[in-house]
């Protein structure tokens, strides 16, 4: 009788046989890696849009740049859509070809004003049909291969100068400005380190705000034993200005006005969370300091802590240091300082005519936005940088501090608690007025600049 081989042995032998089966190889045709000029143009527009959006450029400007590039190199029209973390380019190529859609995820990054200007000039040259597709691709590759950046020490020192300029703006002494510089240097380094390790923005802002407040309290405590005059209030205000200065609240309002609502909502929420982190950190720091017996001097909620010339010097230092912190060139620092001084003068002038500080700040921001849009191409410096630097001195650091100090010191049933909330609300209103004013100036300046450009081109053709 023939014994039956177990089934598992048959399966194992079958697997062994399959291992040594020699079947003819099938030569698969590989996909051609070369791209059509149309796809290369779409990729070029997508890369420029991705870089600009990651650095906070307004969505409408990015969409117009991308469409200008595709109109130059593509036969079929292209639709560009932005939703803060995603940019999409779609092209309908007719009934005989499949539609094309490209999408990229936007990873937020710190602004680099030299990189922004280089990309904007590239897009402008493409729209003017001054570059072939090959030349544009090569130029983009060179721009992104090695973007111009300042060293970390320069960036940290720029953060220190922002804090020192804030102290000078409010009439601080040279000693106070030196302490604020060191504090801003360390705070900028801590903020960058938290960003590198992936800490969420809210907690990064909170931790740095706590650090600034406690260092200010420690400086005030040490000054009592050393016989030095150190105003901890000004140190905290300089830290608040440093932390709030980098927020893109003007761009968020601009996106909302331009009807890019998803992008605007995301950016506005980011600004709210970052500002909330600063508020929470300062409140925690003030609470800890008061528990250890360190008292902060009361500061009048008026900008009369320094004479006019000193205020202008402080405003110029803040603006120049702010753009230096974002990798600006030297000429951009001079422009930003002059615009900030001019904007500060406008706000003082408006207040002299009887306007309150909220309205005066909005008027100054509107003038800054108008001047930035009108002169950005002439100076070859991004209007985003001019606006951001010009409005930094208008940041309501003093009002925000006084409101937070009142909330910490007085219980809810105290008669001084509601006035503290009112001061805090006014600080928020100043920030909103500055954002709306800068956006309004930007909107008004766009058609005026377009008319000037068209007039210049007509005169050039006639001559």
Model-derived features: positions:
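Hydrophobic, membrane-facing alpha-helical anchors
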Residues: 125-139, 154-165, 181-191, 286-294, ...
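Core alpha-helical transmembrane segments of integral membrane proteins
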Residues: 148-251, 325-326, 330
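Alpha-helical membrane-inserting segments
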Residues: 165-166, 170, 186-195, 215-223, ...
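Central hydrophobic cores of alpha-helical transmembrane segments
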Residues: 182, 208-211, 334-342, 388-393
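Membrane-interface helix termini and inter-helical loops of multi-pass transporters
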Residues: 224-231, 290-305, 409-421
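C-terminal transmembrane helix-loop-helix hairpin of multi-pass membrane proteins
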Residues: 235-240, 251-253, 259-275, 304-310, ...
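Generic multipass alpha-helical transmembrane bundles of integral membrane proteins
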Residues: 242-250, 266-355
């Amino acid at each position: 009788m023939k014994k039956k081989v177990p089934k598992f042995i048959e399966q194992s032998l079958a697997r062994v046989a399959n291992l040594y089966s020699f079947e003819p190889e099938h030569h698969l045709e590989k996909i051609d890696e070369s791209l059509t000029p149309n796809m290369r143009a779409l990729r070029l527009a997508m890369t420029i849009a991705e870089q600009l959006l990651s650095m906070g450029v307004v969505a409408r400007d990015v969409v117009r740049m991308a469409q200008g590039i595709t109109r130059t190199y593509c036969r079929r029209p292209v639709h560009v859509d932005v939703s803060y973390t995603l940019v999409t380019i779609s092209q309908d190529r007719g009934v005989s070809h499949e539609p094309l859609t490209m999408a990229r995820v936007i990873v937020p990054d710190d602004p680099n004003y030299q990189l922004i200007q280089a990309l904007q000039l590239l897009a402008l040259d493409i729209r003017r049909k001054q570059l072939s597709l090959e030349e544009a691709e090569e130029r983009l590759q060179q721009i992104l291969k090695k973007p111009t950046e300042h060293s970390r020490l320069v960036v940290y020192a720029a953060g220190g100068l922002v804090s020192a300029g804030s102290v000078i703006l409010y009439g601080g002494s040279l000693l106070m400005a030196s302490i604020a510089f060191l504090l801003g240097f360390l705070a900028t380094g801590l903020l960058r380190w938290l960003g590198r390790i992936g800490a969420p923005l809210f907690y990064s802002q909170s931790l740095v705000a706590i650090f600034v407040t406690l260092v200010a309290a420690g400086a005030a405590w040490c000054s009592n034993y050393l016989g030095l005059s150190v105003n901890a209030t000004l140190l905290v205000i300089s830290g608040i200005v440093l932390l709030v200065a980098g927020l893109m609240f003007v761009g968020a309002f601009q996106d909302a006005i331009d009807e890019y609502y998803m992008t605007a909502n995301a950016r506005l929420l980011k600004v709210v969370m970052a500002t909330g982190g600063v508020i929470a950190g300062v409140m925690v720091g003030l609470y800890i300091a008061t528990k250890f017996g360190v008292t902060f001097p009361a500061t009048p909620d008026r900008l009369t802590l320094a004479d006019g010339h000193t205020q202008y010097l402080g405003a110029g230092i803040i603006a120049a240091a702010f753009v230096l912190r974002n990798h600006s060139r030297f000429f951009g620092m001079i422009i930003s300082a002059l615009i900030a001084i001019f904007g500060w003068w406008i706000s003082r002038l408006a207040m002299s005519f009887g306007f309150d500080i909220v309205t005066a700040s909005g008027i100054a921001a509107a003038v800054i936005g108008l001047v930035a849009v009108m002169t950005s191409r002439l100076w070859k410096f991004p209007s985003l940088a001019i606006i951001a630097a010009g409005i930094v001195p208008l940041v309501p650091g003093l009002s925000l501090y006084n409101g937070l100090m009142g909330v910490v010191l007085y219980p809810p049933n105290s008669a001084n608690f509601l006035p503290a909330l009112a001061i805090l609300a006014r600080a928020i209103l100043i920030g909103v007025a500055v954002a709306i004013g800068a956006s309004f100036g930007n909107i008004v300046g766009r058609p005026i600049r377009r008319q000037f450009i068209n007039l210049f081109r007509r005169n050039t053709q006639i001559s």
